[in-house]
Regions:
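Class I (Rossmann-like) S-adenosyl-L-methionine-dependent methyltransferase catalytic domain
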Residues: 1-32, 44-89, 114, 130-212
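Conserved class I S-adenosyl-L-methionine
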Residues: 35-43
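A short acidic, Gly/Pro-enriched loop at the edge of an enzyme's catalytic core
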Residues: 90-98
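A short glycine-rich, Lys/Arg-flanked "PGG" loop and its adjoining helix->strand segment in the class I
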Residues: 113-125
Length: 212
């Protein structure tokens, strides 16, 4: 499958606002012992720019040239890597915080599970993981079920037959199972209005923070 084309998706419509860190991450940031952060799918630096401004050494990985360029111009001190996160090898015992925000649900679960296991296995001891992914309560789930464009595979994964991409939906138990062995710091399943891009629309999201 192809990665989602964020260059096309956000071309000319994505406002560069002053990024504000996710509330849940900000709330537990004091649990992060060191200064090295890895952001898989950095996007426009929603979390990474505030983290860099707080003095963290942030490495951001993204497949989108647009996103990389926006981050570079808004925060030159970020260490930016242009790569598909499926092909990116996480250096062992290097990062005190590894995060991936609104990215993993755009992968087939086989790839996403591999990435999440790599996050868990390569995180430093006492390090933190932060992710958020679509839940099965997301309105897109029902839309995919009734759409001719999306083919239901299994395990709540859909294949977009037009552009050869995937969209996956998760349960809380599934996330807890993937990150078993970590101490759960925070987990929530919420349904909220997204004002971040395009017309206002709802998302069902699972947010998870775990400590090694």
């Amino acid at each position: 499958g192809n990665p989602v084309d964020y260059d096309k998706k956000y071309k000319g419509e994505f406002p560069i606002l002053s990024p504000k860190m996710d509330f849940e991450l900000k709330r537990y940031l004091k649990l992060v012992n060191g200064k090295n952060v890895l952001d898989l799918g950095i996007g426009q630096g929603q979390n990474s720019i505030p983290l860099a401004n707080l003095g963290f050494n942030v490495t951001g990985v993204d497949y989108s040239n647009n996103c990389i360029n926006i981050c570079k111009s808004n925060c030159p001190e970020l260490n930016l890597i242009h790569s598909d996160i499926r092909n990116f090898e996480i250096e062992k015992n290097t990062f005190d915080l590894i995060l991936s925000r609104c990215v993993l649900h755009f992968l087939h679960k086989e790839d996403a599970y591999e990435i999440m296991n790599s996050m868990k296995n390569n995180l430093k001891n006492n390090g933190l993981i932060y992710i958020n992914v679509f839940s099965i309560e997301d309105p897109m789930f029902k839309k995919c079920l009734s759409s001719d464009v999306f083919e239901f595979l299994d395990n709540n994964v859909f294949h977009n037959k037009v552009n050869d991409t995937y969209i996956s939906f998760y349960t809380k138990d599934e996330i807890l199972d993937i990150f078993s062995g970590l101490k759960t710091v925070y987990i929530s399943q919420e349904y909220s209005l997204d004002l971040g891009h395009g017309n206002p629309h709802y998302h069902g999201v699972i947010k998870y923070i775990g400590m090694k």
